[in-house]
Each structure stands twice: as structure tokens, then as C-alpha cells.
UniProtKB/Swiss-Prot annotation:
Keywords: Glycoprotein, Host nucleus, Secreted, Signal, Virulence. This is Secreted RxLR effector protein 45. Has the canonical translocation RxLR motif, but lacks the canonical EER motif, which characterizes most oomycete effectors identified so far. Belongs to the RxLR effector family. The lineage of its organism: Eukaryota, Sar, Stramenopiles, Oomycota, Peronosporales. It is found in: Secreted; Host nucleus. It comes from Plasmopara viticola. Secreted effector that completely suppresses the host cell death induced by cell death-inducing proteins. The keyword Transport does not apply. Its main location: secreted. Disulfide bonds: none annotated. It comes from the Eukaryota. GO terms for cellular component: extracellular region; host cell nucleus. Glycans are attached at residue 128. The keyword Glycoprotein applies.
Length: 131
């Protein structure tokens, strides 16, 4: 699963449930929770564009679509946030009322997502437990 598809899935869930933030829990094949991320959607398309630019070059038509999307604010900007401590994790989780669980992802997929999140965000992504 590419990071862009992953983002699209989460945004779809956030939009469907009319939430600005969504908690995603990632699991290894044996069912143990490996990572909990909060993905916050606000108005802009910058990070999604950055992620897509890192994967493949964009054609002129796609760039025009992105500029139009930025003007209309149709597409959300993704801000990844993970609490640094277990205490703050509980407080943080209480802020949001809807959770989406994308379970049974392979550990390789999880590592790939985690590494790409780190490389694409300014603030570090902290997981709740080690691999």
C-alpha cells in the first residue's frame, strides 16, 4: 500500500464521518498493535502534493489540477501527529470521537509507512511501541 493510497483511505474515512481528525491504529500480522497515529486534516493540499512529487513526476495537467484544488480548498492538508508519552496519548485520543482501525497490515508495510511519515513531516513521528 503506497503512502498516497493510505492517506486517501484515511481522508475518505474522515470525510465520511465528518471528522477533522482520525486515529489510525496499525497492527502486525499476529494482531498486536504496533503504531497509533493521529492524522489531522486541515484546508490545503501541500503535503499530499509533496508526497506525490516524491513518488513520481507530475504532468502539467496534474499540476493545474493541484493549483485549482489549492484555490478551492477541496483537498485537505495532512498533519501527522503522534503523542510522545503514554499519558498524553490517552488525553490525545479522548479529543477525537471516531477511530478507524486499519488492521492486519504487514510489519513491512508498517515500517514503510512509518519511514515515509518521518521523511515527509517536519516533526518526528513517535510510535507507541517498538517493532
Amino acid at each position: 500500500m503506497s503512502i498516497f493510497i493510505f492517506i486517501s483511505l484515511v481522508l475518505g474515512l474522515a470525510h465520511q464521518h465528518k471528522r477533522s481528525s482520525i486515529i489510525v491504529r496499525l497492527y502486525s500480522k499476529d494482531g498486536f498493535q504496533k503504531c497509533s497515529l493521529t492524522i489531522r486534516a486541515v484546508s490545503a493540499y501541500a503535503l499530499a502534493c509533496k508526497l506525490q512529487l516524491e513518488h513520481r513526476p507530475l504532468r502539467a495537467q496534474r499540476l493545474r489540477q493541484i493549483r485549482l484544488a489549492q484555490k478551492s480548498r477541496v483537498f485537505p492538508f495532512i498533519f501527522y501527529q503522534c503523542p510522545h508519552k503514554k499519558k498524553s496519548a490517552r488525553i490525545h485520543a479522548l479529543t477525537f470521537t471516531k477511530e478507524a482501525e486499519l488492521s492486519k497490515l504487514s510489519i513491512e508495510t508498517l515500517r514503510c509507512i512509518h519511514l515515509q511519515l518521518i521523511s515527509c513531516t517536519r516533526s518526528p513521528v513517535v510510535t507507541n511501541s517498538s517493532y
